[in-house]
């Protein structure tokens, strides 16, 4: 597939077929992530591949608790109706963690986010590779990071960038319309 079509093919997927992701697919997806740019080539990201139904249920529970907290504390109205079923049903959950101290410039120039930025590029690469392999994916962030870290025994010094749901899509997702790019010439106008 041409790259110009690949990024348009990638859609957020919340319905998956009960087909396992193969080790070859997992390897290709994580390798694509590993090739993401990072400050000083520090590659601050690591992956937790979750296929065990009991562990997926714990991740799902973390999402349900976050959803309830948001709904109970005046969050957007859609939060109460948001279904978390896909979390337990997707064949593979890739939790992507990173070391916030490996971000290049660190706190110089008030730019402490290099590690998160490169981990975001890593996740995008993973999702593009999944699409290239005919898999669907979803970058999921609707969870309490502290709860998820506890559930997965993630060391305190690491942060969670997201949980990427990956599997064979149960249906084709339609692309929502995109806004026109806002391009400023030479300075912000």
Task: Walk through the language-model features, giving the residues of each.
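Short acidic N-proximal helix/loop "leader" segments that mark the beginning
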Residues: 1-20, 24, 28
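C-terminal helix-cap and adjacent tail motif
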Residues: 3-13, 161-189
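Small-aliphatic-rich amphipathic alpha-helix that forms the alpha element of a beta-alpha
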Residues: 29, 33, 94, 104, ...
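Glycine-rich phosphate/pyrophosphate-binding beta-alpha loops
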Residues: 37-40
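Glycine/small-residue-rich phosphate/adenosyl-binding loop
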Residues: 43-119
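Short secondary-structure boundary segments
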Residues: 98, 142, 168
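Residue-level "edge-of-site" marker
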Residues: 100, 143, 162
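Short, electropositive alpha-helical surface patch
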Residues: 148-160
């Amino acid at each position: 597939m041409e790259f110009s079509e690949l990024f348009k093919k990638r859609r957020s997927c919340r319905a998956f077929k009960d087909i396992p992701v193969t080790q070859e697919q997992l390897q290709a997806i994580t390798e694509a992530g590993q090739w993401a740019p990072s400050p000083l080539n520090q590659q601050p990201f690591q992956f937790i591949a979750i296929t065990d139904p009991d562990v997926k249920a714990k991740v799902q529970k973390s999402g349900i608790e976050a959803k309830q907290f948001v709904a109970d504390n005046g969050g957007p109205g859609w939060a109460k109706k948001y279904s978390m079923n896909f979390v337990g049903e997707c064949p593979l959950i890739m939790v992507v963690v990173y070391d916030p101290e490996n971000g290049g410039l660190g706190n110089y120039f008030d730019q402490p986010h290099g590690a998160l930025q490169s981990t975001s590029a890593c996740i995008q690469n993973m999702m593009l590779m999944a699409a290239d392999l005919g898999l669907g994916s979803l970058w999921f962030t609707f969870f309490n990071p502290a709860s998820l870290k506890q559930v997965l025994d993630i060391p305190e010094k690491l942060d969670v960038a997201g949980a990427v749901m990956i599997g064979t899509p149960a249906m084709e997702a339609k692309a929502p319309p995109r806004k026109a790019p806002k391009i400023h010439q030479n300075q912000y106008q």
